[in-house]
Design a protein with these regions (language model features):
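Conserved helicase motor core of SF1/SF2 NTP-dependent helicases
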Residues: 2-4, 13-25, 32-161, 165-243
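Detector for small/aliphatic-rich hydrophobic stretches
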Residues: 9-11
Length: 243
């Protein structure tokens, strides 16, 4: 692990169709649980991450995704973002947004894109917006709705499934069934689930955390309120709110 982390601080290039995209990632884990998450991602193929808000789930996952994308010979050719508003049940929502299909999908992934930009900025990259735009233009970052996954086979990709608390068992099973090679990291906070279908006992994330822990190549990481790093006040709010 230490060799991989040291390598992440050096600037390397992602090359697609003759275009070199130069950037650096400098991830510094803030606690033992974040280090556990990084280790699990490198050691497993499919990783489930459960945790409350403010623990850095998305930041760590996306940092490793960018890091692995630029590392040579590790089988990762692109980052694919799958967000809950692109679920089968939300397909109709796409039609109500202006613009092309790609523009609509990227509107749903604004939080993920913002996270990627922040990572690049904190890592010392001068123009993170241009880097992200180049990665998107060269199809190194892509957003896919679940409805487009049926019959597909995803290989050599780092698949980030964020806000997975909104996915039902059926949604999550469909997503996992499309995985062929690379990494798939599925993360969420069940306490923030808003869909009634999920809240009424059909949470795909909770089902996976319970049923799939003993499979070789599958990793599970669970954060608690003690792992909150965003702001100390969030810990106090969480404790009071859930007491």
């Amino acid at each position: 692990m230490s060799k991989k982390k040291n390598a992440s601080s050096a600037s390397t290039k992602v090359v697609e169709t003759g275009v070199a995209i130069d950037y650096r990632v400098n991830l510094k884990c803030k606690n033992a649980k974040q280090k556990e998450l990084v280790k699990s991602i490198y050691e497993n193929d499919i990783i489930f991450v459960e945790g409350v808000f403010g623990v850095g789930k998305t930041f760590v996952i996306n940092s490793v995704a960018l890091e692995m994308l630029k590392e040579p010979n590790n089988g990762i050719d692109k980052i694919i973002l799958i967000v809950p508003t692109c679920s089968c049940s939300a397909t109709m929502e796409l039609g109500h947004l202006p613009g092309s299909l790609d523009e609509k999908l990227y509107n749903f992934a604004l939080n993920e894109m913002d996270s990627l930009r922040k990572i690049l900025k904190k890592s010392g990259n001068i123009e993170p917006d241009k880097i992200i735009d180049s990665l998107v233009k060269n199809e190194k970052i892509d957003v896919k709705p679940i409805s487009f996954l049926r019959g597909a086979s995803i290989e050599n990709a780092f698949i980030c499934v964020s806000e997975a608390e909104e996915f039902t068992k059926e949604d999550l099973f469909l997503i996992m069934s499309r995985f062929e090679s690379g990494k798939m990291v599925i993360s969420g906070d069940p306490l923030q689930a808003s869909r009634n279908q999920v809240r009424n006992g059909n949470s795909g994330l909770l089902h996976a955390m319970e049923k799939l822990t003993d499979i070789n190549g599958v990793g599970t990481v669970k954060f608690t309120e003690d792992d909150i790093v965003r702001n100390d006040i969030l810990y106090d709010i969480y404790k009071k709110w859930n007491s």
